Design a protein with these regions (language model features):
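Short glycine-rich phosphate-binding loop at a beta-alpha junction
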Residues: 59-70, 146
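Active-site-facing substrate-recognition patch
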Residues: 1-58
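PRPP-dependent phosphoribosyltransferase catalytic core
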Residues: 2-10, 133-177
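Short, well-ordered alpha-helices that flank and scaffold nucleotide-derived cofactor binding pockets
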Residues: 50, 54, 76-80, 133, ...
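Short acidic, glycine/proline-enriched helix-loop-strand junctions
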Residues: 59, 74-87, 154-170
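Conserved acidic residues
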Residues: 62, 113, 143
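Short, glycine/charge-rich flexible loops or terminal/linker lids adjacent to PRPP-binding catalytic cores
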Residues: 72-116, 124-129
Length: 177
């Protein structure tokens, strides 16, 4: 098996939790995909970095990140995955800090840079579009949005004028919306 198949197995074995849950979007579901169980796993995290780099290999960007907490381990996995180009990672806070440098985006400066916004999974696109807005406010050029598992956010992200890619769909994981 390759990285893509190996990561899918980690997701289905570790991250898919069956039972009634309320998603951050407010919608209810009979299962939950808890990707932190994968993105923070010692064997799966390197796969996340390689799969997400491969998914976006034809997009030109030099920094990756998104809204904390879902995007953080993805960005770090991509940063450490190596590849044909170096990447910086950044973290977008939900709100600016009231102390210190009062930055909303932590890490290397992204002003004037081409960046990729990532998220672990997305149903409505709200979290990643919040990150995109913050990135644009500081002058970053967002080249696209990439998620590990798409729960339906593609239309909303594309409607915001951004290319969108997902490493896996719900069907890829044997789940129905």
């Amino acid at each position: 098996m390759g990285d893509h198949d190996d990561l899918r197995k980690f997701i289905t074995d570790l991250a898919v939790v069956h039972g009634r849950v309320v998603l951050s979007s407010g919608r209810e579901a009979d299962w939950y995909v808890d990707l932190r169980r994968v993105t923070l796993h010692h064997e799966a995290a390197p796969l996340v970095g390689r799969v997400m780099r491969a998914l976006t290999a034809d997009w030109a960007y030099d920094a990756v990140g998104g809204l904390t907490l879902g995007a953080d381990p993805i960005a770090l996995s991509m940063l450490h995955a190596g590849g044909d180009r170096p990447l910086d990672a950044f973290v977008v806070r939900k709100a600016g800090k009231a102390h210190g440098l009062q930055r909303r985006i932590e890490g290397p400066d992204v002003s004037g840079r081409r960046v990729l916004a990532v998220e672990d999974t997305s149903t409505t696109g709200q979290s990643v579009l919040t990150a995109v807005e913050a990135l644009r406010e500081v002058g970053a050029e967002v080249v696209g949005v990439a998620v590990i598992v798409d729960r339906g956010a593609g239309d909303a992200v594309r409607a915001a004028g951004l290319p969108y890619r997902a490493a896996y769909t719900l069907a890829d994981l044997g789940l129905v919306a």
